[in-house]
Design a protein with these regions (language model features):
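C-terminal helix/juxtamembrane-tail motif
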Residues: 1-4, 82, 487, 503-521
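Cytochrome P450 heme-thiolate monooxygenase catalytic core
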Residues: 2, 9, 35, 120, ...
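N-terminal membrane-proximal hinge/A-helix region immediately C-terminal to the signal-anchor transmembrane segment
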Residues: 2-138, 146-148, 152, 174-182, ...
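Conserved cytochrome P450 K-helix E-x-x-R motif and the immediately C-terminal K′/meander segment
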Residues: 62, 72-95, 269, 273, ...
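Cytochrome P450 heme-thiolate "Cys pocket" and heme-binding signature region
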Residues: 159, 322, 327, 393, ...
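Cytochrome P450 heme-binding "Cys pocket" and the immediately downstream C-terminal segment
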Residues: 221, 347-350, 415, 468-505
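Short, small-residue alpha-helix embedded
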Residues: 332-343, 478
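Conserved cytochrome P450 K-helix/beta-meander segment immediately N-terminal to the heme-binding cysteine loop
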Residues: 417-446
Length: 521
């Protein structure tokens, strides 16, 4: 009996020690450390709300965000308060040098362009937030890679996005655009020359078809299931974000995590079939498009394995294919839809762009070599990227004490670079910063920005978006072909509601009135 009492006493003591240790860790993580960092940040000159246990600013964050997205706004390009509502509220309340409590972790608003440049120039010191298992599942690949994996993958994938290689994909991009033009012409012809459509689903499918053809020699129909899986993963990930600031909260979302893994495995299986089918085709000696992204990626990793032994494994190749499908289509669709909205609103610029297309290309098929001569369309795309940057904000983290300019940033801090605030800042861009004026880019980006690193729609530095040139080529071709065939006008039913759902999208669609130019000639 005495032995059992002794064992029970020891077990009780061990349990008490474990509970005390766990309670101390919780206290350190959820109270002592945040309060210590809060004091340090205020000493650095940053202002924000006092830390509130566990939730920080998040209850207020969700309330403000919910209110902002509950209704559309009057048409204006001054969209910061709707796209980043709580950050806008905090900057207005506390100034540019401010912070938000994302649970127990502070997020500093970095508004100084030179500090943004320094952060993005040092990806090892100011790194992406990891581990981030949700992001790894939804996107993965190069976009979330870090450590030795990132430079190894970047070196190989760079070959696929070489400008000369990209030219080989343009015929596929052209076919995708031609299919969409044909669909729109059929709709217009059925309604005596003009009709109203919601352009957003068409543009989403066009972007998906372009990346399917250019990357895999496939098309949207064949890749439809992959895009459906990506959408379902994104919806689940968005739900995770609501409690992601609470430590260990994800461990209790057992059902959601299981579903996420099932979706991810099905996507991997779908992509594996595409990759293996391509490999078998090559082995049989059948002709394939050697310039599509998958062919270049497989060839580059094969050579790297032979020469350096550091190529990508088949699992890593499939992971990068997932990025092609998801990020590749999403960013292109966002840029193209906001370009259509802006041109439908600012018909003077639409006319100027169309005149340029007819002057450079004529009314026949697109000449790929002449895409670079479309200066006005390039100016328009830059202005759309400035006003409606796909990402809206960039996020980096510190895991140790870091020097940033004259500041010493403590560890366990996130750094938020609200791109949309930079892009709409009148101190940087002038009094018309919130107006649509592509003319500001008439002498190029450097002249428009006065040499400052303030135009970063595709990020900046070593981790700049590797597919940005491809996205610009895709959108430039699509815009040119649309303007060759149609005039565009915003419908009275259009509701202006930019929304940051991972990337910026039109919450209620993009209703435009299409008129077939051939019907008016």
């Amino acid at each position: 009996m005495e032995v059992w009492k002794l064992l029970a006493s020891v077990a009780g003591s061990l349990a008490l020690i474990i509970i005390s240790h766990f309670a101390l860790k919780l206290y350190q993580r959820l109270w002592a450390r945040p309060k210590k960092i809060e004091k340090q940040l205020k000493e650095l000159g940053f202002k924000g709300n006092p830390y509130r246990f566990l939730h920080g600013d998040m209850k207020e964050f969700f309330a403000v965000a919910g209110e902002a997205t509950s209704k559309p706004m009057d048409f204006s390009h001054d969209i910061g308060a709707r796209v980043l509502p709580y950050e806008h509220h905090i900057v207005k309340k506390h100034g540019k040098s401010s912070f938000v409590w994302f649970g127990a972790k502070p997020r500093l608003n970095i508004m100084d362009p030179m500090l943004v440049k320094e952060i993005l120039s040092k990806p090892d010191d100011f790194h992406k937030v990891y581990p981030d298992p949700v992001a790894d599942l939804v996107v993965g690949g190069l976009s979330t890679a870090h450590g030795e994996k990132w430079p190894r993958h970047r070196k190989i994938i760079n070959l696929a996005f070489n400008l000369e290689k990209l030219k080989g994909t343009l015929p596929e991009v052209y076919l995708s655009c031609k299919d969409t033009i044909s669909k729109w012409k059929s709709l217009v012809s059925a309604t005596s020359g003009f009709t109203e459509i919601d352009a957003w689903p068409y543009i989403e499918n066009l972007a998906r078809d372009m990346i399917s053809r250019a990357a895999f020699g496939s098309n949207f129909e064949e890749g439809r299931r992959i895009f459906q899986l990506h959408e379902m993963q994104a919806d689940l990930a968005f739900q995770f974000m609501g409690t992601s600031y609470i430590p260990w909260a994800s461990h209790f979302k057992i059902k959601e995590k299981k579903k996420m893994r099932v979706l991810n495995q099905e996507m991997i299986d779908q992509l594996s079939r595409i990759v293996k089918k391509r490999e078998e085709t090559v082995k049989r000696g059948e002709e394939v498009n050697k310039d599509d992204l998958l062919s270049v990626l497989l060839e580059a990793t094969r050579k790297e394995n032979q020469e350096e032994g550091s190529g990508m494994s088949m699992e890593e190749v499939i992971d990068e294919c997932k990025v092609f499908y998801s990020a590749g289509a999403d960013s292109t669709a966002r840029l193209l839809i906001w370009t259509i909205v802006c041109l439908s609103k600012h018909t003077d610029w639409q006319s100027r762009a169309r005149d340029e297309v007819f002057q450079v290309m004529g009314k026949k098929d697109i000449d790929f070599e002449k895409l670079s001569h479309l200066k006005i369309i390039t100016m328009i795309l830059y202005e759309v990227l400035r006003l409606y940057p796909p990402a809206g904000m960039l996020l980096r983290a510190t895991s140790k004490k870091m020097k940033l300019g004259n500041l010493t940033i403590p560890p366990w801090v996130h750094l938020t670079m609200p791109v949309i605030f930079h892009n709409h800042d009148t101190e940087i861009w002038g009094e018309d910063a919130k107006e649509f004026n592509p003319e500001r880019f008439s002498q190029g980006i450097s002249n428009a920005t006065k040499g400052l690193p303030v135009f970063i729609p595709f990020s900046w530095g070593p981790r700049t978006c590797i597919g940005q040139h491809f996205a610009m080529i895709e959108v430039k071709m699509a815009v040119a072909m649309i303007l060759q065939n149609f005039s565009l006008e915003l419908s009275p039913s259009y509701l202006h509601a930019p929304e940051l759902y991972f990337l910026m999208r039109p919450q209620y669609g993009a209703q435009i009135i299409l008129q077939d130019l051939s019907a008016t000639q």
